[in-house]
Amino acid sequence: MALRGSHRLQVILKRCIASPLFHSHAPNRRSSQPAIKGGEPNSNGNSGHDQQNGERKGKGWRRLVSFFVPFSLGAVVSAAVIKREDFTPTIAASKMTGRRRDFNFIADVVAGCADSVVYIEIKDTRHFDYFSGQPITASNGSGFIIEQNGLILTNAHVVINKPHTMVQVRLSDGRTFPATIEDVDQTSDLATLRIQVNNLSVMRLGKSSTLRSGEWVVALGSPLALSNTVTAGVISSTQRASQELGLRNRDINYLQTDAAITFGNSGGPLVNLDGEAIGVNSMKVTAGISFAIPIDYVKVFLERAAEKRKKGSAYKTGYPVKRYMGITMLTLTPDILFELKSRSQNMPSNLTHGVLVWKVIVGSPAHSGGLQPGDIVTHINKKEIKNSSDVYDALADNSKNLDIVILRGVKQMHVTITPEDP
């Protein structure tokens, strides 16, 4: 294309040179210059006038060439650019073909196991919506189906968090069923529910003992009641001891991940790239720091629960029943405090201990008293709070009201809570 254009330009230039107009107009700018003295002939026998005409012809040629050459070069470059634009995207597109199919491993995981993830709602049977007349939602969370006949695994704090409630489960296809709580281990924060449905999609259980730091994982659940929400990340640690997290009476090495785990997807599965549950989403401390209960520990709980059911009784362990406040909390250990201070400028630099309020149940005494997620409890009834055990001890006290000192950002505040009797 470029060569053909150059050939045509040469033809045009030759025709212009042969044209009388070219020779007649070329001398105009040089007419004021003096002629060769006496008009004597040169060494070739031509007169000075002929020599002058020759010089004018040469200069006219150079002017015309200098005028047209930039356009010729521009045409060549433009042709090259057009040719490159014609072919480069085609080559790039051909190289990218199939990448969605070959490299979307997260989507493959979700497609294989999302149907076994459920949304769990806790309804308060004492408070009703003004317009619908239905019980209001006190709390929500996630779970996943582990048996085709309707057995569901979740966190204990998702379902055992408030008296006078009922549990509803919504499947991935939108169907909703009432659920009964079968087994509870509040020490490890695990529970099972059952709905009266058969032939359900089941989540496969993997092995958490073979996990390595840096492995990709996917957290599935229903944060903010948005079913089948997916977050992804990597395993940050496979051996985060419960003592490091300040969790009372728990002998668990938690999985730490940077996949986002929130209120709604706690209780849902943490899944490896083979589509197997390798943990139960449990809690989030801050952005990039979340924890899950390893599936190997969960299997021990399920085996004990199955043995109890064979004997005709339910498997229930945990703390003695205390008065109810309505929060999920986490002890601020030195390691967790260091992480929080490094990630947030709103953390007081002199804070050395306390309990982080991770979740507040709607309609609970804590909610009515003004506690909010993210508050840090430092004192209750003038007693220093260093871990979650101190909060349980305060609930066991006979005081009617709890005067709680909290930090909300860098601001210190007082709230008063009246716990409910069991």
UniProtKB/Swiss-Prot annotation:
The chain crosses the membrane at residues 64-82. Residues 41-51 have a biased composition (Polar residues). Coiled coil: none annotated. It is a single-pass membrane protein. One of its GO terms (molecular function) is serine-type endopeptidase activity. Its main location: mitochondrion. Residues 139-302 are annotated as: Serine protease. Serine protease that shows proteolytic activity against a non-specific substrate beta-casein. Promotes or induces cell death either by direct binding to and inhibition of BIRC proteins (also called inhibitor of apoptosis proteins, IAPs), leading to an increase in caspase activity, or by a BIRC inhibition-independent, caspase-independent and serine protease activity-dependent mechanism. Can antagonize antiapoptotic activity of th/Diap1 by directly inducing the degradation of th/Diap1. This is Serine protease HTRA2, mitochondrial. It comes from Drosophila erecta.
